[in-house]
UniProtKB/Swiss-Prot annotation:
InterPro entries noted in UniProt: GlpG_N_sf, Peptidase_S54_GlpG_N, Peptidase_S54_rhomboid_dom, Rhomboid-like_sf, Rhomboid_protease_GlpG
Listed EC numbers: 3.4.21.105
Localisation: Cell inner membrane
Gene: glpG
Protein name: Rhomboid protease GlpG
Superkingdom of source: Bacteria
Enzyme class name: hydrolase
One Gene Ontology MF term: serine-type endopeptidase activity
Species in which this protein is naturally found: Yersinia pseudotuberculosis serotype I (strain IP32953)
General function of this protein: Rhomboid-type serine protease that catalyzes intramembrane proteolysis.
Membrane topology: Multi-pass membrane protein
Residues annotated as catalytic: 202, 255
Sequence similarity: Belongs to the peptidase S54 family.
Length: 278
């Protein structure tokens, strides 16, 4: 038997197995620490399965896969769907860096509530002038500042969703590099327009959006992706920020800078990928 792939989503794995069954290919699902494994009994069918898998990874939510489950008369796997607590779900979908940044942001936000924004910003904000340039933590620490509950919830939700899958699939070092690079460049871009009076993880989040989306489009075998609809919404939200539609103070330059950095890093990292969008 040959292991074909590991998929984190059991329902998607079942849909692919059922779809291949309609092509007279028998696949088996087995539990795995990262989700489930799909195994092929007949090695002679491997090339056909790999071809269909490529198509599946490009569009796993295509109705033909769900329709195959109904045709096979099997909409559930024999594997149990376990119930997890919110904390277990949070931890299972994130690595140590993802969780550490979340804890750090929450701790700093609580400190800002207690001591006031300016007291914390005096230590962590983007360098105010050249005398602070050697305080190198400032080039990144501004990303951990948040000024409202909605601000921190929105950013940490995206950070967990995108950073978690990136760290799980590509490793902690890859996420660390993207976080540092995007924090520096998004902070620099925003400082050109607002000085040092800004903060938030959104520049890094937009870098993650760009990286995860483009990597998923060009190299789906890496196992990370952002649905096109969510990416389109994010771009529209970015554009809306320039028109002050919601009356919010938005770090537009940080968003744009972060998105560009994420796209550039993803393009570079997938430059040798054989699977690109046609």
């Amino acid at each position: 038997m040959t292991r074909v792939i590991v998929i984190s989503n059991l329902r998607l794995a079942q849909a692919f197995v059922d779809y291949m069954a309609t092509h007279h290919v028998a696949l088996e699902i087995r539990p795995d620490a990262q989700g489930v494994e799909i195994w092929l009994a007949d090695d002679e069918q491997l090339s056909a399965v790999q071809h269909e898998l490529e198509q599946f990874l490009l569009d796993p939510l295509n109705p033909r896969y769900q329709a195959a489950s109904w045709q096979a008369g099997n909409v559930n796997s024999n594997l149990p769907y376990q119930r997890f607590s919110y904390l277990q779900t949070l931890r299972s979908q994130a690595g140590p860096l993802t969780l550490s940044v979340m804890v750090l942001c929450i701790a700093i936000y609580i400190l800002m509530l207690i001591t006031g924004d300016m007291a914390v910003m005096s230590w962590l904000a983007w360098p105010y002038n050249s005398s602070q340039y050697l305080q190198i933590w400032r080039w990144v620490s501004h990303a951990f500042l948040h000024f409202s509950l909605l601000h921190i919830l929105f950013n940490l939700m995206w950070w967990w969703y995108l950073g978690g899958q990136m760290e799980k699939r590509l490793g902690t070092s890859k996420l660390l590099v993207l976080t540092i690079v995007s924090a520096v460049f998004s902070g620099w871009g925003q400082s050109l327009f607002s000085g040092a009076n800004f903060g938030g993880l959104s520049g890094v989040v937009y870098a993650l959006m760009g990286y995860v989306w483009l990597t998923g489009e060009r190299a789906p075998e890496h196992g990370i992706s952002l649905p096109r609809g969510l990416m389109a919404f994010s771009v529209l939200w970015l554009i809306a920020g320039y028109f002050d539609i919601l009356g919010l103070s938005i770090a537009n330059a940080a968003h744009v800078s972060g998105l560009i950095i994420g796209l550039l890093m993803a393009f570079w990292d997938t430059r040798n990928s054989a699977r690109t969008v046609q």
